[in-house]
Amino acid sequence: MDEGYLDIGGNKIWYSVYGKEKKNTPILVAHGGPGFSSMPEVVSEFAEQRPVYFYDQLGSRRSDKAKSKDDYSVEYFVAELEGVIKALQFTDIILMGFSWGCGLIGSYMLEKKPASVKALILSAPLLSTSLWDRDQREHITKMPSAMIKAIENGERSGDYTGEYQTAMMAYYNRHVCRLNPWPDSLLEALDGLNMDVYQTMWGPSEFTVTGKLKDFDLYPRLHEITIPVLLTCGDNDEAGVKTLKDFQMAFPQAQMAVIPNASHLHQIEQPQIYKIVVNEFLKNQ
């Protein structure tokens, strides 16, 4: 693994690469959050066949922090992704996103229309906040009544502490990561979560959206992205199966895979199945 920093708009942005010497079309990974960071586990193993690049977005773990929380925006992150691609001098590339990283990639594709991007891998995608919220509300109805009430009270009052936090963690154990205990790699990444970025862009939890992404919606324009797309989610994913099917129908060239006995972090929960699915897609890219 090699790593370094790129100067993107005056900010130091960390990146790493696995399998740099490989000749197949490289993958560039956009992590989730916003405010999360790169997790090379599992995904770096695709470097057996091609280079795999990761980078931490502004505010995330190994990269610079913004001078002001107002600097965190979809527009900035799209420009940053474009800057990373230019700085690394890719001619052809496959973009892989996780959760918010999928929305970032989708925004980049629709705004910049890059000819260099040959395919997309979108795992547990956030592409429409309204559809995301539809999934969350459906999941919440299946929780114990006391937890439903705690979530409703928190959202009504704006107090996201106490019982709201307890309900939130119960929800995460069902729909974000079903492994027990959570793996060290996830705990380490969560320890580095930048809440300034997360709360500015998203909100206090995965199912309560109060930030800049509240009205985010690429769904009406997905038909404009005509390259091959692989969509994945877990069968218990907070990014729901029904919504994934809606996205598949919207993209002109999309296939989807639902990973069994898994949730939002299905690449960590079921790594062997995830690798088989992605490698099958990559055979033709």
Segment roles from a protein language model:
Residues 7-66, 70:
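Conserved HGGG/HGGXW glycine-rich cap/lid loop of the alpha/beta-hydrolase fold
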Residues 29-33, 99, 234:
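Glycine-rich His-Gly loop
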Residues 53-100, 276:
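Active-site loop/oxyanion-hole signature of alpha/beta-hydrolase fold enzymes
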Residues 91-135:
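Conserved hydrolase catalytic core segment
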Residues 118-162:
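Flexible "cap/lid" loop of the alpha/beta hydrolase fold
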Residues 152-227:
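Alpha/beta-hydrolase
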Residues 219-262:
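Conserved loop-alpha-helix segment in the C-terminal half of the alpha/beta-hydrolase fold
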Residues 253-285:
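Catalytic active-site module of serine/aspartate enzymes centered on a nucleophile-bearing elbow/loop
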